[in-house]
């Protein structure tokens, strides 16, 4: 179950990640943090794991633009992107067990 935003990531880094997502993908996407930042076991330079659900599979161009934007950003850590529509059910279950909503659309009380 998705939890309220309680992740091991400073607010300015959250805003930066959201701004990058919004600049390259439709506003209606759902994005979740998972991994060590969602479980609050991150170390200083732990990567940021993001699962993205655009309602469809992301294009290679979208993934490339996002990867480049995150790489060129001021975030002090690597961002690993996972396309929700490009993973198997086992991987989805693993992510669902610890995910924390990053976007409003990903919150459990959001419409859709």
Regions found by a protein language model. Give the residues of each.
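Catalytic core of pol beta-like nucleotidyltransferases
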Residues: 1-30, 38-44, 54-112
């Amino acid at each position: 179950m998705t939890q309220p935003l309680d992740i091991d990531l400073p607010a300015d880094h959250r805003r930066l990640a959201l701004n990058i997502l919004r600049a390259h993908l439709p506003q209606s996407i759902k994005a979740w943090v998972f991994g060590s930042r969602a479980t609050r076991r991150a170390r200083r330079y732990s990567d940021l794991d993001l699962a993205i659900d655009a309602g469809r599979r992301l294009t290679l161009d979208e993934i490339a633009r996002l990867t480049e934007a995150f790489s060129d950003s001021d975030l002090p850590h690597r961002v690993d992107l996972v396309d929700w529509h490009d993973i198997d059910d086992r991987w989805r279950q693993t992510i669902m067990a610890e995910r924390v909503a990053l976007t409003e659309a990903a919150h459990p009380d959001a419409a859709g």
